[in-house]
């Protein structure tokens, strides 16, 4: 009894300690988020203030009207950036609180992805965009494990339960980054499909956004395909062939305000919150999102969303019984 009590007490203390660590980590992240948000909001505010002061200083000088137009253009640009930033911050705050999302709608995912591909083509007419199917390429050895691969063909019609506007936001954010940070004539492959995986949505959504998790997912898909068990998942991949992101920084792109080049991100109109919002939305759907390298260079973003449980295969005995019953009825 004493030994059992000691084990229970140690277990309870371990859980309390883990809870304290988790709370401290959450508090630290919140402090960092507030600090980063304050810094990001200060930048456009400082620009607005600076150009307003410049206008006041120059309004009585010769050529003041032309310079005033220039100042107003800068003020408008900074104001627009601040508006986008505030909207993204509010969006994240609502998602953190579990508000602003309704995952009970029927979402035509294929239409959402096709619309995004059309939008990207309109933005970059010289860019080659291929849409196709997603499949698993079997591994050859330990150094070359199984992985996702692109196959030519029509994207399948996929409908799932979720929040249509939020999932559209995820896809739009990904395509927006491709437009901003890759050459306008570099090719893009967009593939999608439904694959079974022997992993629950709850476990999937808790996996860290790294390539080890991707390998774990591919293994779960191979088991799901061979055993016909688990959950069917809609998988969408966006592969660009731009400058890419170093392997050690790929998981960081989902951190709030993370940008590989902050000055370039501001020039391109990015807030550093797009991928953080995408991850929050995907996790709210009990899904998974991850960044990895594209074959031949570039960045690939993979979005995985649950569709429905896999229909189990009938047991051989059950099939035999059904056949026997059918035969008896026929004889009668």
Regions found by a protein language model. Give the residues of each.
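Short beta-strand/loop element within the Bergerat-fold HATPase_c
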Residues: 185-199, 222-231
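Membrane-proximal coiled-coil signaling linkers
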Residues: 14-59, 71
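Short helix N-cap motif at coil->helix boundaries in the Bergerat
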Residues: 109, 244-255
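Short helix-loop "hinge" at the ATP-lid/N-box region of the Bergerat-fold HATPase_c
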Residues: 178-179
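Glycine-rich ATP-binding loops of the HATPase_c
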Residues: 286-292
